[in-house]
Amino acid sequence: MAKITRRKFLETTAKIGGLALTANVAPTFLRHAWSQEKHAAYLNAQIKWRQVEGEEIKILVTPAHYFNKFRAVSPQFEELTGIKVTFDIIPPREMREKAVLDFGAGTATYATHTGDPMFLSLYEANKWIEPLDDYINDPTLTDKKWFDKDDIIPLWLAADSVNGKLYALPSEGEATIHVFNRELYEKKGLKPPATMEEFKETAKLLNKIDGKAAGAALRGFRGAGQNLYIWPSLFLAWGGKWFGADGKVLVNSEPGVKSLEYYCDLLQNYGPAGVENWNWPEIMEAYAGGNVAQFIDANSTASVIENPAKSKAAGKTGYQRWPKGPSGRRVTSIWNWAMSINSALPKKKKNATWLYIQWLTSRPTQLSSALFLESPDAVVRTGVNRISIWTDPTYRKAINFTPDYADVVLTTMKEDTDPDWRPRVPQWPKIGEVMAVAIQAALVKQKTPKVALDEANAEIEKFMKK
């Protein structure tokens, strides 16, 4: 696996820009030449990188490994631009709350944050964030050919847009895929399922195999980013729609009820005990420990699953796209960490923020940071935002968990995503909480799926009318 240290990171970005580092440089020019060459990938762009030199921006991020990488390589941006970048690091839920408080108060403490795309409609409705077209179309701020926005995964861009306008850029993302233990499949003579019904049948056949492994696991923990990160894929795969053409809420429609019945039946009968309290870390750890035969969740789990020091499933795992639902659709969960510009910032800080977002989401930074080792336990990023990187031989070699892993993820991201997989409306935070409660109530048999969704539908109707 290709791995990059801090020095190697700088060398790699130079090579991406078309210049190899040269050792035979006259001493009087050494510092200048080194500076020029390590920034070559960026100096090739027709951008005035130092136009707001001396500005300082603060960014709110989560403690995830990909943001550790971004923070570790950000000194290169500071040297390139003369812009000081500082970070506050807090967990996702608290981060969203803090960002909303900052937006609402207009204090502009944070220039940008690693946001949830589902909140962009709320931000846009309150004019808390800037549309990015003016920045992208400004030739002093952006070299459109160099930046090549069209290389970014299209449906992540769609998810970061509101009413057709782009309000954020994806810095990191993921797709949900089917992850399964090949050895257990072979033991039972099973083939990877083509449909969700076949998936449930494999869960039944694999359940308690060798006396312990659960047949399958999905997120059961209550939350808009937990159980409601998975069930919407089932809802749409069953042919569901959140709203009718007349705006009527449709979560208690037949596809809603049937997909929730499926989810409950699968986990109640073939899932692990206590799955209603499981989020992705519990699922990943159980699978790695041999206690779950298969699951559907983020492709990023592969970095841990394929680490022999942490996983019994390393080298024994298969990856495939979601099986098709009754409607014939595969619908993956769509996610990216969306970086927007705080509208309350003064103009120079807005420009400084855009320069950072552009730098971070550019191909050179995405590729080099993906391979950068910020600590001895660091793993390669599996959520780069560029199609060209997913097809890059260096990157594909680094994530060669199985011969088809990269193709499975890239195809999923290109073909199985729907930006409206969850409703992108300002009321989303309320919808997310109501639906998460309903789904868990059905899972733990407090209510039938029909009753849970009828009640959720009525509650959502009330606040959607306001």
Per-region residue spans from a language model:
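N-terminal export signals
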Residues: 2, 8-32
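Hinge/lid segment of periplasmic solute-binding proteins
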Residues: 37-51, 117-175, 227-230, 314-320, ...
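Conserved C-terminal helix/tail region of periplasmic/extracytoplasmic solute-binding proteins
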Residues: 39-43, 50-52, 56, 84, ...
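Short, solvent-exposed loop/beta-turn-alpha elements that line the ligand-binding surface or hinge
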Residues: 44, 48-54, 133-151, 220-221, ...
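C-terminal lobe and pocket-closing loops
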Residues: 51, 137-140, 300-314, 325-434
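Extracytoplasmic "Venus flytrap"/periplasmic binding protein-like
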Residues: 75-152, 183-194, 286, 290-294, ...
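Extracytoplasmic/periplasmic solute-binding protein
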Residues: 157-171, 176, 200-249, 255, ...
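Glycine-centered hinge/linker elements that transmit conformational signals in sensory
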Residues: 202-205, 246-277, 318, 322
